[in-house]
Design a protein with these regions (language model features):
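Protein kinase glycine-rich loop
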Residues: 17-23, 28
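Flexible N-lobe loop architecture of eukaryotic-like protein kinase catalytic domains
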Residues: 21, 66, 75-78
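AlphaC helix of the eukaryotic protein kinase fold
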Residues: 48-73
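Activation-segment/catalytic-loop signature of the eukaryotic protein kinase fold
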Residues: 85
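Conserved short submotifs of the Hanks-type protein kinase catalytic core
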Residues: 89-103, 107, 111
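Activation segment signature within eukaryotic-like protein kinase domains
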Residues: 120-121
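Protein kinase catalytic-loop region centered on the HRD/HxD motif
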Residues: 124-136
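C-terminal lobe helix-coil module of Hanks-type protein kinase domains
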Residues: 178-268
Length: 338
């Protein structure tokens, strides 16, 4: 059941203004706080959850919470900021910044100069590397999920697919499917940093050509071929053309293994280090620790189906997505159905 306009959340701290969108198993709302500031609240979509078996539903909730916590710990100028997490009824929620500006989805209706497009791609590459270091995949990279702040050239990556596509692939529209590699449309194929590489390369393809590439599923079935972007826009440099094709290789093992490797193919490294990366500053570590403490204090007991879901908190290592730089508390997922 969706929250209605005017509904109060988190002991009256937030007021729902409208529904912003639904993607995968999540739903996002525009809300205001007590001072009238706008923010985004993201949680799981109860209507979609009802279509899952009880065991898969609990597993998805665990994954959503764990990945939400990783996103909260990802402090980076090009990653959407999570203000806080809280529990409303039976659902875990994220209160996030609301970004004033336009998405690259609006800009992709025109062909961007290569230099401008690469500037946005480097920013998104840095954002993804920061997320991957937290053990978090995005799995939904596309122009519409890259916001450019009003009056600036600063891009921000939004709408992380928390828990959804990783184990529960869903039917997507064709315009979204062109950014999805084959492993995102399968329940059995492994995902990794190379998954986001494909989507970021496809995003650059669209920004430089104004055209949508053939979908990975059509290419796999032999129904279509991937047209090299330089054949569409002759102004694209040979180096960028080759990097896009490398990032959009059909089979995961044929792609660059990490976003950093792919950015190097584009020639975007700076003295061997991508800007904005490196050793995490001390203040960021403190923020991460305080975030974990806040989560533990804020997560209250809520019973689902007679089981203490929110009490099921145990230490767990981050998944092997590159390497995690933090070790917060996570929810233990129930056994997966055979």
């Amino acid at each position: 059941m969706a929250w209605i306009i005017g509904q109060k959340l988190h002991n009256g701290q937030y007021t729902i203004e409208k529904t912003l969108g639904k993607a995968g198993f999540s739903i996002t709302y525009l809300a205001t706080d007590a001072q009238g500031n706008e923010l985004v609240i993201k949680t799981l979509n109860e209507d979609r959850l009802k279509k899952l078996t009880p065991l898969r539903r609990e597993s998805l909730k665990c994954k959503f919470v764990n990945e939400a916590r990783r996103l909260e710990g990802c402090r980076h100028p090009h990653v959407i900021q999570v203000y806080k997490t809280f529990v409303e009824g039976q659902f875990f929620c994220l209160a996030m910044e609301y970004i004033q500006g336009k998405s690259l989805g609006n800009l992709s209706q025109r062909v961007l100069p290569e230099k401008e497009a690469l500037s946005y791609i480097q920013q998104m590459g840095e954002a993804l590397i920061a997320a991957h270091q937290q053990g978090l995949l995005h799995q939904n990279v596309k122009p519409a999920n890259i916001m450019v702040r009003a009056g600036q050239y600063q891009a921000v990556l939004i709408d992380f697919d928390l828990g959804g596509k990783f184990e529960y692939p869903v039917t997507v529209g064709w315009q979204d499917e062109v950014f999805a590699p084959i492993e995102l449309q399968s329940k059995t194929r492994s995902r990794g940093t190379f998954t986001d590489v494909y989507s970021l390369a496809a995003t650059l393809y669209v920004l430089l050509t104004g055209k949508l590439p053939a979908t990975s599923s059509d290419r796999q079935k032999g129904k279509a071929d991937l047209i090299p972007p330089k054949q569409i826009n002759s102004q694209i440099s040979q180096r960028v053309n080759k990097a896009i094709l490398a990032g959009m290789k059909l089979e995961p093992e044929a792609r660059p293994k990490s976003v950093l490797d792919w950015l190097k193919l584009l020639g975007l490294q700076r003295d061997g280090v991508i800007s904005g990366l490196g050793k995490k500053p001390r203040w960021a570590m403190v923020v991460g620790i305080l975030g974990v403490v806040g989560i533990v204090a804020g997560v209250v007991s809520a019973s689902l189906g007679g089981t203490g879901f929110w009490d099921n908190i145990i230490p767990e290592s981050s998944p092997d997505v590159n390497s995690s730089t933090s070790s917060p508390l996570y929810l233990k997922s129930p056994e997966t159905e055979e």
